[in-house]
């Protein structure tokens, strides 16, 4: 389904310079604190205002960002929006929005092009493989979003939505409704389908999909698939390559399983073989995971309704994960022992996660082979759209929860060690507290995490409490370094 972009309108056309700062009377600066004791400044410039359309440029600066975050935001209040984005001359972007045409010259290829529509049945079509990243929010309504951009974040909100992605890298969150997500091409996709009876089909690229609450139909693609049914009676079809499947709660049916596939479940599996349903027939490697309900973890989620539902889906997957349920069990024990909750809070635009302990005075650091003081509670800051390389956003959340584990158990490693870099560059020094949650070795005296002489002391976190433990379980590439090296 590829709509044809409209012909040039007969009316006036608008030219927008994405690098413009706007006149002083249309520019304002705001100062905010996304985390305790951290300040950031956002400059907002109004670049265009016409019938149903406003265009703003936002530039956010602060210590949390390697460089300023530059966003060019299109916002339409039309009751129904048809928006087509095509490639113009000399790296310009042409936006046809209902009966208006905009010629956009982005500030640079890093500038994020944001599109926000109002409530209604909207269509957004990104027709070209743009270098600029796109962020699309369509709001409530039965919306259609098609993208061929190299990187796209899509949030469709409530409604029965349809999303089609191409060969780029896509993050999709369709929210409440009976939604369809279809991947076409080699792009990597992370999709959260939210509540409803949803349909998902993968293609050649790596796929991560979480069906959310509801009875879903999930079909893996030709690449590596991570398929999570979540709550509901789901039908999951494994792809022809490698598959890691989390059934979630419900009466689930799995089709096309192979001996190489891994299935994590707390209930009986029903598979389809030659058209017949076969209860509890084991094909592939099955891991039985029994865990506590989400409501009993003691974790608190703060943010929008969309963020809350999204994090709940992440946590339900982790509760059905071999490594994840062990991490959450340890954190739940700390919450019950101390009566101090761990909070997960929404983090926007930051290409990272963060854990802030309730007390960071160094007393939680292990020393001379002895644990430090247990520092309970704390806050995890989580950007649910952020991931690096071939990773999935869930890995960033897991990384920060592993930091929480070290603080609540008094097992934080002090000092620094060389990053485990295997390329041509010399390894820089990295804080041990980061290396240990990735699962990389630290140059320290081995530490006995469980105070059990029968188990070996370690120079990194035990397996369930590392990001690499989750990546390995998901079938993704392990991190060999803490720092992401772009050209090595």
Residue ranges and their predicted role:
Residues 350-395, 404-408:
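Active-site scaffold of zinc-dependent metalloenzymes
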Residues 8-13, 66-95, 188, 265-291:
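GD-rich hexapeptide-repeat beta-solenoids
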Residues 98-130:
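LRR N-terminal entry segment and analogous cap-like coil->beta motifs
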Residues 412-488:
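Active-site or metal-binding loop neighborhoods of secreted/extracellular toxin and effector enzymes
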Residues 255-353:
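A metal-dependent hydrolase signature that marks the N-terminal structural subdomain at the beginning
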Residues 400-416:
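Catalytic Zn2+-binding segment of zinc metalloproteases
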Residues 117, 126, 136-138, 147, ...:
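Glycine-centered beta-turn/loop sites at beta-strand termini
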């Amino acid at each position: 389904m590829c709509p044809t972009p409209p012909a040039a309108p007969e009316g006036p056309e608008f030219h927008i310079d994405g690098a413009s700062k706007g006149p002083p009377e249309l520019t304002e600066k705001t100062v905010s604190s996304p985390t305790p004791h951290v300040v950031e400044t956002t400059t907002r410039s109004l670049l265009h205002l016409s019938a149903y359309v406003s265009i703003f440029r936002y530039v956010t600066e602060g210590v949390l960002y390697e460089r300023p975050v530059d966003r060019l935001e299109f916002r339409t209040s039309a009751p129904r929006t048809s928006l087509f984005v095509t490639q113009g001359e000399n790296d310009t972007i042409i936006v046809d929005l209902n009966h208006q045409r905009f010629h956009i010259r982005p500030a640079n290829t890093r500038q994020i092009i944001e599109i926000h529509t109002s409530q209604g049945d909207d269509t957004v079509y990104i027709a070209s493989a743009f270098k600029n990243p796109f962020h699309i929010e369509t709001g409530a309504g039965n919306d259609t979003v098609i993208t061929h951009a190299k990187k796209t974040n899509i949030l469709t909100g409530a409604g029965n939505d349809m999303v089609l992605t191409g060969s780029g890298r896509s993050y999709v969150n369709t929210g409440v409704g009976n939604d369809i997500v279809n991947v076409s091409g080699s792009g990597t996709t992370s999709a959260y389908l939210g509540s409803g009876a949803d349909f998902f089909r993968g293609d050649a690229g790596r796929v991560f999909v979480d069906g959310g609450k509801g009875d879903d139909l999930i079909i893996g693609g030709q690449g590596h698939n991570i398929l999570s049914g979540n709550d509901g009676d789901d039908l999951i079809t494994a792809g022809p390559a490698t598959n890691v499947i989390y059934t979630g709660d419900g009466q689930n049916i799995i089709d096309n399983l192979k001996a190489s596939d891994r299935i994590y479940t707390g209930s009986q599996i029903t598979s389809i073989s030659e058209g017949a349903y076969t209860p509890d027939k084991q094909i592939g490697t099955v891991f039985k995971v029994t865990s506590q309900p989400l409501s009993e973890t003691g974790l608190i989620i703060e943010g929008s309704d969309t963020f809350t539902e999204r994090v709940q889906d992440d946590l339900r997957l982790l509760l059905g994960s071999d490594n994840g349920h062990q991490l959450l069990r340890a954190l739940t024990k700390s919450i019950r022992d101390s009566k101090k909750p761990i909070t997960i809070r929404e983090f926007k635009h930051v290409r990272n996660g963060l854990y802030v302990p309730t007390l960071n005075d160094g007393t939680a650091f292990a020393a001379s082979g002895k644990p430090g003081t247990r520092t309970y509670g704390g806050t995890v800051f989580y950007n649910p759209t952020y991931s690096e390389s071939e990773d999935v956003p869930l890995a960033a959340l897991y990384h920060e929860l592993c930091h929480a584990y070290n603080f609540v158990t008094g097992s934080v490693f002090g000092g620094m060690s060389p990053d485990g870099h295997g390329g041509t560059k010399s390894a820089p020094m990295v804080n041990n507290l980061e290396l240990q949650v990735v699962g990389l070795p630290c140059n320290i005296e081995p530490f006995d995490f469980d105070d059990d002489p029968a188990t070996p002391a370690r120079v990194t976190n035990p397996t369930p409490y590392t990001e690499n433990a989750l990546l390995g379980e998901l079938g993704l590439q392990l991190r060999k370094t803490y720092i992401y090296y772009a050209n090595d």
